């Protein structure tokens, strides 16, 4: 008998060789029905896996990201099986799960079109209905090469050849279909429910232009049709909220052919941007930060010293000045380090917090540029904190508090991810371990749950990333906290300690918005262009019904402007219904309709963007209400 400890701490005895699915069924048939994979002794496994030793078991359902990956990876195999049935000459490349779905790359003589989607979906449904068991089999390298050679699956052969000599090679079979795969997978194809083929794209094999162009078929899947319907509805809503369209329609920003990747901000967009920057400055002033500004162009020697030249050169822009090599900064940190070095610092001054709204430039391939979300020039709300080693935990927690204040203001829930040492990194393993443990301790002391991203840290240190969730349930990585022991060493940063000697400070790099441009893009789609009152470029539009009420309209505009409210008036000779509809399309928070009665009584007829007609109010009453709403930054 073997002993299995469950997540709730309880323990059960089972005969050796029982499958994880059988264990789940013994615990609860409903639990087994919803389970998609399991973690046994820390390793994610198929539910069909047999248990041969004591261990700890956690069953995963669709709510768990790891289970969603298994579900959609199995979905990709079903789609590949369907394509092979419909177009047998198609060769298989790769088919991973991705965020919100999956894809499979094919080398096929058939050119896929959207008209093929229905046929692929129908064949997938037949495979799902057949409920084929999904069976794992391990092979020797020779067996695997022979198997896929007989089937002329050239891409699979290349993958096998590139595996390490000691790699475990496995296949998964469902019905007649067999694929090279490490797994894990669902117990059977019948576990899949709602599927939808979404789109097509071209993709070079292994991402290299030197390799063949493959056809990539994107799709998604969910365990319930209602979940798929909800996802598709949100996709449609996302199209309506596309920040590129809204940016132009609302007069916020544009990206022109004359400057690909370099956005133009229009007057209303600058109002929005300035409000965000003003709020940033005020909150950072209250949190003890000093603001600096560093040059956009700095010498090659500086970038070599910082390590950016070696690690980031392909993403940088360069120029020559007085026969010397210079680079346009892709990051603000080296400039901040030079500012620190301008003075001798005592331990009594630390922590020293310096913030910068710094314009940076990064070379991005034209194919990945996307409105404000992916650009070549953007403003980072960078800050660098220089501190004593014993201040690390408190400073990290202080940044977390600031991040929470910002994201809560906009109504963004968020989750946290910890990224550890990447393959290409500066510094020793020991320093990386100290830095990583400091971030973990700060997270745990603040009681924050977090996910670990192995190997995804910056080249100079581990980091905490903040992923906010918008109104369409999409996640965006914006804020980050990076702990750095490397740069202070490279730039010979020091402070005078209590003992009178020179010591090395520790450094935090952090952003909250991340990129002002990208954050504005996210806000535009999150609110669908209907920004909170305090952010709205135009907060009130005054709509006189007739020429007789225009003088009163000018008086209302003047009073509201005097109170610091952003107001404009529409004096055109259009019908009032037309003016109201246009104001609604422009997503202006308050429309004030003014006729003869309002002029006589000193009132305004108020229409709210969400609540509709609020009736007549005294101008002074309305003014006080809106001033308070702006001051309180109401959502």
Curated annotation (Swiss-Prot):
Its cofactor is Zn(2+). It is an enzyme of class 6 (ligase). It catalyses: tRNA(Thr) + L-threonine + ATP = L-threonyl-tRNA(Thr) + AMP + diphosphate + H(+). Gene3D superfamilies: 3.10.20.30, 3.30.54.20, Anticodon-binding domain, Bira Bifunctional Protein, Domain 2, Threonyl-trna Synthetase, Chain A, domain 2. Residues 242-532 are annotated as: Catalytic. Zn(2+) binds at residues 333, 384, 509. SUPFAM superfamilies: Class II aaRS ABD-related, Class II aaRS and biotin synthetases, TGS-like, ThrRS/AlaRS common domain. Binds 1 zinc ion per subunit. Belongs to the class-II aminoacyl-tRNA synthetase family. HAMAP family: Thr_tRNA_synth. This is Threonine--tRNA ligase. It comes from Syntrophomonas wolfei subsp. wolfei (strain DSM 2245B / Goettingen). The gene is thrS.
